[in-house]
């Protein structure tokens, strides 16, 4: 059991970050904000994937003017990402956003920051301070010679101080780097200095394969130490994939469950079915299931029976046939050609039963009532 760090609670619309709330999964739309239909299409896809909070860039006043329409079509908390121009921040706040991502230090004169903070206070909108190694201020680059974890922490604390001086405390902080070791060091150091909730991620992690590994190592390490209240996986791919990877990281640590947890063997000389093909097909076919269930796809007698006994639904294949288990009990025998369809059918039935019963599955192994 991971003991999570205690942080303040910050409300982002109807979703709480910090204060012991479940770790939330975020993503960001990846199109021109002025293309409102496409923005809303991506947001709907993110909602279906389980995204808790979505961020949309507001690089110009023209983009900011689109937020009113985006707000109407968005059913999850909406965050606006603003830099440099305080007027853009005021415009998106008027549109009804739920959180503002800025760095107070790059908004301009103090009176401009005060206007933004006052507008956030009036509307109950929190601010995320987002420090990135790639855009660290010149003063910290001159002090340390290059982006460092210490420089990033100092930058974050500088921005926090600006807001605290204005008696504003609805703050979330992120302190990201594309270097996993640097990101880990920065979050560790920052967590010792503030009790604000932390938004955790590896920025510009890269393409799906390498970026998923970097994110799993970086985000996973920090979460395993009890640090972090919300996460965003940054990948050069469809935003829905970011959400899927985020949930897999949380599931791997037992911090939050959603959808199917696939348990499958890597295959070897003992296996007598095309297990790799079967396991990947099962994963693809079950992406629509949001009820947390453990599904095992095993190919031999060494570990197969044990995993089948522990999983909610399992397939144990051999010699061209498959044995199907539900709750550890064998319920059906099928051919290799039909085993995927049969397994998917049983999983869908199990998920429907759980939803109908009103029970909320948690943790690993058989679902437990909460």
Curated annotation (Swiss-Prot):
A single GO BP term for this record reads: terpenoid biosynthetic process
Q: Which reaction does it catalyse?
A: (2E)-4-hydroxy-3-methylbut-2-enyl diphosphate + oxidized [flavodoxin] + H2O + 2 H(+) = 2-C-methyl-D-erythritol 2,4-cyclic diphosphate + reduced [flavodoxin]
Pathway it works in? Isoprenoid biosynthesis; isopentenyl diphosphate biosynthesis via DXP pathway; isopentenyl diphosphate from 1-deoxy-D-xylulose 5-phosphate: step 5/6
State one Pfam family annotation: GcpE
* Uppermost EC category: oxidoreductase
**For binding [4Fe-4S] cluster, which residues are annotated in this chain's numbering?**
265, 268, 300, 307
GO: which molecular function terms?
4 iron, 4 sulfur cluster binding; 4-hydroxy-3-methylbut-2-en-1-yl diphosphate synthase activity (ferredoxin); 4-hydroxy-3-methylbut-2-enyl-diphosphate synthase activity (flavodoxin); iron ion binding
Known InterPro entries for this protein?
Answer: Dihydropteroate_synth-like_sf, IspG_bac, IspG_bac-typ, NO2/SO3_Rdtase_4Fe4S_sf
Keyword line = 4Fe-4S, Iron, Iron-sulfur, Isoprene biosynthesis, Metal-binding, Oxidoreductase
Question: Any binding details for the cofactor?
Answer: Binds 1 [4Fe-4S] cluster.
Q: What is its EC number?
A: 1.17.7.3
This protein's cofactor list reads: [4Fe-4S] cluster
Check the UniProt entry and state the signal peptide residues, or none.
none
Q: Which NCBIfam families match?
A: ispG_gcpE (TIGR00612), PRK00366.1 (NF001540)
Q: What function does the entry list?
A: Converts 2C-methyl-D-erythritol 2,4-cyclodiphosphate (ME-2,4cPP) into 1-hydroxy-2-methyl-2-(E)-butenyl 4-diphosphate.
Q: Record's family?
A: Belongs to the IspG family.
Q: What is this protein called?
A: 4-hydroxy-3-methylbut-2-en-1-yl diphosphate synthase (flavodoxin)
């Amino acid at each position: 059991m991971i003991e999570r760090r205690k942080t303040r609670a910050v409300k982002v619309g109807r979703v709480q970050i910090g204060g012991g709330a479940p770790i939330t999964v975020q993503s960001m739309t990846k199109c021109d904000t002025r293309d409102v239909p496409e923005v809303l299409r991506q947001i709907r896809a993110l909602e279906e994937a389980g995204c808790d909070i979505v961020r949309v860039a507001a690089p110009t006043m023209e983009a900011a003017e689109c937020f009113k329409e985006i707000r109407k079509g968005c059913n999850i908390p909406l965050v606006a990402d603003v830099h440099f121009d305080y007027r853009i921040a005021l415009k998106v706040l008027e549109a009804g956003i739920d959180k503002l991502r800025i760095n107070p230090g790059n908004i301009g004169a103090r009176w401009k920051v005060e206007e933004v903070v006052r507008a956030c206070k009036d509307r109950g909108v929190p601010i995320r301070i987002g420090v990135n190694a790639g855009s660290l201020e010149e003063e910290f680059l001159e002090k340390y010679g290059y982006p460092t974890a210490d420089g990033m922490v100092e930058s974050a604390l500088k921005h926090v101080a600006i807001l605290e001086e204005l008696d504003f405390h609805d703050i979330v902080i992120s302190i990201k780097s594309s270097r996993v070791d640097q990101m880990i060091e920065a979050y560790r150091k920052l967590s010792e200095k503030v009790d604000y909730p932390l938004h955790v991620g590896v920025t510009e992690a890269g393409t799906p394969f390498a970026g998923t590994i970097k994110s799993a190592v970086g985000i996973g390490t920090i979460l395993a130490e009890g640090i972090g209240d919300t996460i965003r996986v940054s990948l050069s791919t469809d935003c829905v994939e970011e959400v899927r990877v985020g949930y897999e990281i949380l599931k791997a640590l037992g911090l939050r469950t959603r959808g199917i947890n696939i348990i499958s063997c890597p295959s070897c000389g003992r296996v007598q079915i095309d297990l790799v093909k079967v396991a990947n097909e099962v994963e693809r076919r079950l992406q629509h299931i949001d009820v947390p269930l453990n599904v095992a796809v095993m190919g031999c007698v060494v570990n197969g029976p044990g995993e089948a006994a522990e999983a909610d639904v399992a397939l144990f294949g051999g010699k061209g046939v498959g044995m199907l288990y539900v709750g550890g009990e064998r319920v059906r025998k099928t051919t290799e050609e039909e085993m995927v369809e049969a397994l998917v059918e049983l999983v869908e039935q199990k998920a429907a039963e759980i939803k109908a019963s009103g029970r909320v599955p948690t943790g690993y192994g058989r679902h437990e009532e909460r």
